[in-house]
Amino acid sequence: MSAPVEVAYLGPADTNTHEVARALFAHASKLRPLSTIERVFDAVEQGEVPFGVVPIENSIAGTVRETVDALITGSLRIAREHELAIRHTLAARPKVTLRDVRRVLSKDQALSQCRRWLDAHGPDWERIPSTSTAQAAKDVLSDPEAAAIAPPLAVKNLGLSVLCDNIADRDDNATRFVVVAREDSPPSPRAPGAPSPDKTSLVFVAPHERGGLRKVLGVFDDAFVNLTRIESRPLVGLHGPRWEYAFVVDAEGHRLESPLREALEGLDAMGALVKVLGSYPRALASVSHALDLSQARPSS
């Protein structure tokens, strides 16, 4: 990923996804915001761009189903992941103070994740859902009685005043983003005997028989493969029969290396339906927003 490339991401600009795309592709010749996750996948699949950046999981809200479903039904693979600690900032146009605010705008998820703070400090404020946190930030520029719950990138780029920073009800809010491409990543370098720094995401359908799921999980256990995440997904929305489920799994290791390679061979031998969604370097920890809001306009 060293040569200049064009990269698509779930827009609009100045969102958390935009910040992640900038961090991962600082060399990109162009970052292209697209309106939906489906559109990002289409752009990569059709060769318009080599990479796309989309959210896949939030530590509070859970899985982003549109991303997972697109990976299951499409041809793209995960090539990289990035975790971002989410920071919700209450901001308004310059010279607006908390006493002026009569309504607060943001994406519905952000409003819900800041509910306790809003109940305590703005119980009478009208809470207005917006299409995105970045759009909310733009909308308050023309409204002297409005504040937005917005990401730091939007606050900085739009020159908003910070009314209060870090207003989320929980301080462990993080979102996991993935880079999707036509190929996943090769195995990462490591010292002999060192654990793999890679992660593999896959989906499987267990044999439709008594103990089928237990048998599949037993294959991973027998191969000493650690599963870091497992989630069921109804097949009915994926052109499958009603009341049957696929299981989306994150496993330590790379699909081309032992012991995960042997586990995948074992699943194939037992007749389990398996699709690898990608092997890629594991994100070691959530990364806080790189932006410094100390230069943003303070407000009382």
Protein language model features and the residues they cover:
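Domain-level signature for soluble enzymes in the chorismate/prephenate branch of the shikimate pathway
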Residues: 1-300
